[in-house]
UniProtKB/Swiss-Prot annotation:
SUPFAM superfamilies: Cysteine proteinases
This protein's UniProt keywords: Hydrolase, Protease, Secreted, Signal, Thiol protease
Entry-linked InterPro entries: NLP_P60_dom, Papain-like_cys_pep_sf, PG_Endopeptidase_C40
One GO molecular-function entry: cysteine-type peptidase activity
Protein name (record): Probable endopeptidase cgR_2070
Active site: 127 (nucleophile), 175 (proton acceptor), 187
BP GO terms, sorted: proteolysis
Listed PANTHER family: NLP_P60 DOMAIN-CONTAINING PROTEIN-RELATED, PEPTIDOGLYCAN DL-ENDOPEPTIDASE CWLO
Signal peptide: 1-35
Domain NlpC/P60 stretches: 97-211
Sequence similarity: Belongs to the peptidase C40 family.
Length: 211
């Protein structure tokens, strides 16, 4: 009986080693090294194989860490950093985008409100009164007049407009509105036109800024 058990043990070790090779250890095992535990998932069978961790390309085999648990601590730092850092970069960009959209959303609630010279809301607005009011809804303070807004913000190219940017129109930046995305602007034009949303082409473009 003792001899029979030894034969079974040898057969098991050979089967486990063959399974590890089938997962991707196709190259010859490197020079003698510290033995690593190789596990056959779901069987409770394991065996120590010297030098298997040094097999070229072994780390690239999908799921190899389930067979050789010690490899789970050897993940490539660059790949790990890419997975961890990518969401962080997106998270950093999110506040600016959400703030711009919040400005647009605030302005959009006032569509249909009457124009009033010098009015800053909440029931009537002139052009720069609307932009100032919408920005104040997200905690931002900007200059009061259209010319000052156009002069003091960070210049933005027409092709780089984002929701919430302030767009100036006409010579001298005498009129401003809030870029609402998709080529449109929300603005308070004049006493004969209630606060509305129009195409950017509705008026001659002067410049655009971002605060």
């Amino acid at each position: 009986m003792g001899k029979h058990r030894r034969n079974n043990s040898n057969a098991t070790r050979k089967a486990v080693a063959a399974s590890a090779v089938a997962l991707g250890a196709t190259a010859a095992i490197a020079s003698p090294a510290q033995a690593a535990e190789v596990v056959v998932p779901g069987t409770g069978i394991s065996v120590d194989i010297a030098g298997i961790e040094t097999t070229p390309g072994l780390n690239n085999v999908p799921g190899i860490d389930q067979w050789i648990p010690s490899l789970s601590s050897q993940a490539a730092p660059t790949a790990y950093a890419a997975v961890i850092d990518a969401p962080a970069a997106e998270a950093q960009a999110a506040p600016a985008a959400s703030t711009g959209q919040a400005i647009v959303d605030a302005a959009r609630t006032k569509i249909g409100s009457p124009y009033g010279w010098g009015a800053t809301g909440p029931n009537a607005f002139d052009c720069s009164g609307l932009t100032s009011w919408a920005y104040s809804q997200v905690g931002k303070s900007i200059p009061r007049t259209s010319q000052a807004q156009a002069a003091q913000g960070t210049p933005v190219a027409y092709s780089d407009l984002q929701a919430g940017d302030i767009v100036a129109f006409y010579s001298g930046a005498t009129h401003v509105g809030i870029y609402s995305g998709h080529g449109t602007v929300i603005h308070a034009l004049n006493s004969s036109t209630p606060l509305s949303e129009h195409s950017l082409d509705y008026m001659p473009f002067h410049s655009a800024v971002r605060f």
